[in-house]
A protein has these predicted regions:
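A general structural signal for short secondary-structure boundary/capping elements
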Residues: 55-58, 109-117, 144
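Short charge-dense sequence patches
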Residues: 1, 20-34, 70, 111-117
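Conserved short beta-strand elements that form part of the metal-binding/catalytic scaffold
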Residues: 29-68, 118-123, 178, 191-197
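N-terminal beta-strand motif that seeds the catalytic metal site of vicinal oxygen chelate
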Residues: 1-15, 97, 126-157, 164, ...
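Vicinal oxygen chelate
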Residues: 13-14, 66-114, 150-233
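Short, structured interface segments
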Residues: 111-129
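Short glycine-enriched loop/turn motifs at secondary-structure junctions
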Residues: 1-3, 58-63, 103
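Core segments of cupin and vicinal oxygen chelate
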Residues: 9-48, 158-175
Length: 233
């Protein structure tokens, strides 16, 4: 039998933290408050443990990260979002706790628990080589879209993804293939909703609706818009 590594994350308000993981479908396997705080949960063969933060130390936000490799990241994200929607009345997308968005073909997502621990769920066969800046095999707005995807999905850097898309549309939008432009607008709609900017989202939707897209092209942007709809619900 091989070694088993168990991450120990910050516990915070332990009851609240364990309740959050119960909501996600984990089973609480240990809970102790005296003489010190310690708890543990387990789900799908994966254990997460929680200990007390060091006293007198101000912890940087989201400084503790755990990676969980799994076989079907899309199914897990769906299960988590449904559980969170049932518990909170909506899918929490900002602050603590929250879950990052998910689109068709995406290979990872992040759950940030009430304490600020980040648990990143990753498709086991995720490609090893990520070309930051966008794939060199692409050009123009297509490469901009790939760069924005990496910033958004791998670095959780929505602000930079927005800037990259806006600059890219300004530079390449006039000559870009119609579908690439529509995908860029759809991505910006989702990012505007995540940034709590409904006015910007409405403006972008108007621009997207004005585009004369084929049925196939409209179908291609539905995944991006579905992520936006999940945020708005």
């Amino acid at each position: 039998m091989g070694d088993t590594a168990v991450p120990v994350l910050w516990g915070g308000d332990l009851k609240n933290t364990l309740d959050f993981y119960r909501t996600l479908g984990y089973a609480v396997t240990y809970e102790q408050t005296r003489p010190y705080v310690y708890g543990a949960v387990e789900g799908n063969g994966c254990a997460l443990h929680f200990g007390a933060e060091p006293r007198g130390t101000e912890l940087p936000a989201e400084s503790v990260i755990c990676l969980v490799m799994l076989d079907d990241v899309a199914a897990r994200h769906h299960a988590f979002t449904e559980a969170l929607r049932t518990h909170y009345g909506k899918v929490p997308a900002k602050g603590y706790p929250r879950i990052t968005r998910f689109r068709p073909g995406q290979s990872r997502f992040t759950v940030v628990d009430p304490v600020g621990n980040s648990v990143i769920y990753i498709q086991r066969d995720e490609p090893k080589d990520i070309e930051y800046g966008g794939s060199r095999e692409l050009a123009g707005l297509a490469r901009v879209l790939d760069n924005a995807r990496i910033l958004r999905d791998f670095k959780n850097d929505d602000a930079t993804a927005i800037r990259v898309l806006e600059v890219g549309l300004g530079r390449f939008g006039a000559e870009a293939p119609r579908l690439d432009k529509a995908m860029a607008l759809a991505a910006l709609i989702e990012l505007a909703i995540a940034a709590d900017d409904p006015a910007r989202s409405d403006t972008l939707r108007t621009e997207l609706r004005a585009m004369r897209l084929t049925e196939a092209e409209r179908s291609a942007v539905e995944g991006e818009l579905r992520a936006a709809a999940d945020l708005a619900d």
